[in-house]
């Protein structure tokens, strides 16, 4: 059913497509945004106790339902501002259980929100403290455990890696993305 709307003397804009979001999280990181503006690197912020590892700790302590409710509030905020499509990354889980929890929340948002949602698996967002001395062991977990489970449950449309100094190397990134490619 098509409806004609007279837009004479008006402006019509297409909706915004936000291709990089982290809408599922337990606590905001605005202070870190100020630190980034002041020139601190992500690595320096992490050394101060902030960053992705702190977000992962808080997310681990938060229920799936709480994550969904707070994320939906943010979804409605961006809808009101004109967003019509959004990519939502995981990446604050940093273990299989919590990454899957995030992706399930994103899938629920996909089913219940009025906008187009794409899920992005970002298990390679930071190296958990327990793997700092052996990051390749964590990369192996991403490749051999996380990616197969994400694929089996069809929880993600895309896969992503945070390739940066102090995080994942070019070689790690290639290994992870090639593993993801095997699952489509």
Where are these regions (language model features)?
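Glycine-centered loop/turn motif at secondary-structure junctions
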Residues: 41, 49, 82, 181-184
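Metal-coordinating catalytic core of metallo-dependent amide/deamination hydrolases
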Residues: 55-70, 76, 84-184
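Metal-associated gating/positioning segment near the N- to mid-region
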Residues: 2-69
